[in-house]
C-alpha cells in the first residue's frame, strides 16, 4: 500500500465521533448515540404536541389524520382564501367570537375596512377627476375636509380611478384592433 493510502486509512480509523451539530444529530436521526448518556433534546414538532381537536395555545390548527393501513389519496381542492378562513372560523369559534376574530385578523394583516363612498362623494370626486386626474396634496386635503374623508382615502380613490381609466382605454383599443382585423379577414 502506498504511503498516501496508509495515511488516509489511518485518518479514517482515527476519525472523531460525530458532532452534536451534525444534521443527523439535530434531526434526531443518529441511531449510534446512547440514549442514557445524551441529554434529552425536545425537538419543536407542533404537529405532535396538538390535541385531537387541533387546538394549541388557543390557535386552531387543522391537522390531517392519515390511517397507516389505507393508501394516501390526494385530492386537489381549490378554495379561495376567504372560504378557507370561513371554514376555519366556523370550526374554531362560536358566532359572536367569529366576528371579533375576523376583525382582529384583518387588523393583523394590515388591512383596513373598505371605504364606502356615497353618491354625492363619488360625483364630486368624478368632477375633480375630469379636470385633473393627478390632484396635488392641497387639493386632496381640501376634498378630504369637504367630503369628511381621510386624505389617504382620496389619494387611493384617484389611484384606483386612474387604473380603471387605463384598463378601459386598453380594452377599447383591443376592441378597435379586433374589429379592424375581423373586417380585413372577411374581405
From Swiss-Prot:
It is found in: Nucleus. Residues 110-169 bind DNA. One of its GO terms (cellular component) is nucleus. Its main location: nucleus. InterPro entries: HD, Hesx1, Homeobox_CS, Homeodomain-like_sf. GO terms for molecular function: DNA-binding transcription repressor activity, RNA polymerase II-specific; LIM domain binding; RNA polymerase II cis-regulatory region sequence-specific DNA binding; transcription coregulator binding. Gene3D superfamilies: Homeodomain-like. The keyword Cell wall biogenesis/degradation does not apply. One of its GO terms (biological process) is Spemann organizer formation. CDD domains: homeodomain. Keywords: Developmental protein, DNA-binding, Homeobox, Nucleus. First expressed at a low level in the late blastula stage (stage 9) in most cells of the animal half of the embryo. Following this, predominantly expressed in two zones; the dorsal blastopore lip (Spemann organizer) at the beginning of gastrulation, and subsequently in the anterior part of the neural anlage (the region of future forebrain). SUPFAM superfamilies: Homeodomain-like. Pfam families: Homeodomain. The N-terminus interacts with the LIM 2 domain of zyx. Regulates the earliest stages of development of the anterior neural plate. Plays a role in forebrain development by inhibiting the expression of otx2 and pax6 in the rostral region of the anterior neural plate. Necessary for both neural differentiation and neural patterning. Controls Spemann organizer development. May act as a transcriptional repressor. Belongs to the ANF homeobox family. This is Homeobox expressed in ES cells 1-B. It comes from Xenopus laevis.
